A protein has these predicted regions:
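Short, surface-exposed beta-strand-loop junctions and turns on beta-sheet-rich folds
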Residues: 35, 54-57
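Structural motif
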Residues: 21-23, 50-52, 72-73, 93-97
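A short, polar/proline- and glycine-enriched secondary-structure boundary/capping micro-motif
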Residues: 57-65
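Terminal domain-start leader segments
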Residues: 1-49, 76-89
Length: 97
């Protein structure tokens, strides 16, 4: 539900996908409360990225319309690979807290 609201907001603001890195915001949007996760939200879908420690847990708590992507290697490589595979040309990055 919260992700759907964020998607609607993205559409209003030009539909550029958003990379969320703050775990508090990820928990608020997805329910995931682990220590490693990244969320890419676009107007069409959401992609949750985490390592194998959290695969089963993440799949059990993230919304059904949020795809899980297994992080192999470092986080930057996983995020970069996901962005390239989706053909994303621009992305907003959450400001650090």
């Amino acid at each position: 539900m919260r992700l759907k609201r964020l998607r609607k907001e993205l559409i209003k603001r030009g539909a550029i996908p958003y990379l969320i890195t703050d775990l508090k915001n990820i928990k608020y949007l997805t329910g995931f409360s682990g220590s490693n996760g990244y969320l890419i939200v676009s107007e069409k879908n959401s992609i949750f990225i985490s390592d194998s420690r959290y695969e089963e847990y993440a799949k059990s708590v993230i919304p059904e319309d949020c795809e899980f992507f297994l992080q192999e290697g470092n986080a930057f490589e996983a995020i970069s690979s996901t962005i390239k595979k989706r053909g994303i040309k621009e992305i907003y990055v959450e400001a650090s807290n």
